[in-house]
């Protein structure tokens, strides 16, 4: 970067006055030494000098400063600042080497590895509770026609097979008979919004009058249940 023509140099301090001759001497003795290394060595040597050895250079720096103020009375030191575009570049620059197309970070992760990672996330969904992913686990494509048919028959199976005491106690039209909906249409079908669920058609709700709890009896020797309740004959047959 070229300096403007009207640029005024800053007056030298005592170290600059001393190092001006020492730098030239050290550069001649070590021609392959870098300028930054020369500056480091000169700074270390300057700190080792005593106050008496520094005094002539301090006095020379004062004289040069007074002469500079006389020649440039309006001079004001303005440190050189970096342009804003350079500051923005430095803010986002990272000291990482660039390997081009042979970067191991790029070639190390192949497409098959990426596919396996995505597949592992899909396999992990099987271990999640159903409430966390209700729609992904109930995808219609995951169910066969036989599975859907078994799901439609599930309410009737519950009404007949899992409640054996309903038929033996003569409660077909009582508390347990409401499950099978004998007087209504019993067809079921998958829900249109969520095929994983089965929705019954035209099944009436249970009424409070039909919910009759079974009666418990305590029988003593010589007593029978005849004449106690109307269900005695049915219960005797079941026993």
From Swiss-Prot:
Keyword Protein biosynthesis: no
Residue ranges of the annotated DNA-binding region, renumbered to this chain: 8-76
GO annotation, cellular component aspect: nucleus
GO terms, molecular function: DNA-binding transcription activator activity, RNA polymerase II-specific; RNA polymerase II cis-regulatory region sequence-specific DNA binding; sequence-specific DNA binding
Entries under PROSITE patterns matching the protein: HMG_BOX_2
Gene3D superfamilies: High mobility group box domain
Record SUPFAM superfamilies: HMG-box
Expression (tissue specificity): In the developing embryo, restricted to the hypothalamus, dorsal thalamus, optic tectum, a region of the somatic motornucleus in the midbrain and hindbrain, the vestibular nuclei in the hindbrain, and a discrete ventral domain in the developing spinal cord.
Coiled coil: none
Record flagged with keyword Repressor: yes
Keywords annotated in UniProt: Developmental protein, DNA-binding, Nucleus, Repressor, Transcription, Transcription regulation
Gene Ontology biological-process entries: brain development; negative regulation of DNA-templated transcription; negative regulation of transcription by RNA polymerase II; nervous system development; neuron differentiation; positive regulation of transcription by RNA polymerase II
Subcellular location: Nucleus
Entry-linked PANTHER family: SOX TRANSCRIPTION FACTOR, TRANSCRIPTION FACTOR SOX-14
Record function comment: Acts as a negative regulator of transcription. May function as a switch in neuronal development.
Protein name, UniProt field: Transcription factor Sox-14
